[in-house]
Amino acid sequence: MNIRPLHDKVILKREDVETKSAGGIVLTGSAATKSTRAKVLAVGPGRLLENGSVHPMHVKVGDTVIFSDGYGVKTEKIDGEEVLIISESDILAIVE
């Protein structure tokens, strides 16, 4: 994938979500929620501060993160693959 995000933007690939409940029931429709875990594919250089310096990013390519899936999350198709473009501030945690 040939994409380079700007500023504090992060490109994510959403992880697949489990489609069966713990009891073995297949979940469909609204019961099968989207995962809020994703793999980081690309990271911008950081947020530009008022004094002209750049605040470095905390996430790096390859990290698995948990993110806030709501306003500000942009979905795009790049090279036939659906990716998410978000600000680093919408990332809630890095999974270790």
Swiss-Prot record:
Name the record gives this protein: Co-chaperonin GroES
SUPFAM superfamilies listed in its UniProt record: GroES-like
Keyword Cytoplasm listed: yes
Protein purpose: Together with the chaperonin GroEL, plays an essential role in assisting protein folding. The GroEL-GroES system forms a nano-cage that allows encapsulation of the non-native substrate proteins and provides a physical environment optimized to promote and accelerate protein folding. GroES binds to the apical surface of the GroEL ring, thereby capping the opening of the GroEL channel.
Protein family per UniProt: Belongs to the GroES chaperonin family.
Subunit structure: Heptamer of 7 subunits arranged in a ring. Interacts with the chaperonin GroEL.
Keyword list, A-Z: Chaperone, Cytoplasm
Subcellular location: Cytoplasm
A GO term from the CC aspect: cytoplasm
A GO MF label: protein-folding chaperone binding
Gene Ontology biological-process annotations: chaperone cofactor-dependent protein refolding
Organism phylogeny: Bacteria, Pseudomonadati, Pseudomonadota, Gammaproteobacteria, Pasteurellales
Pfam families assigned: Cpn10 (PF00166)
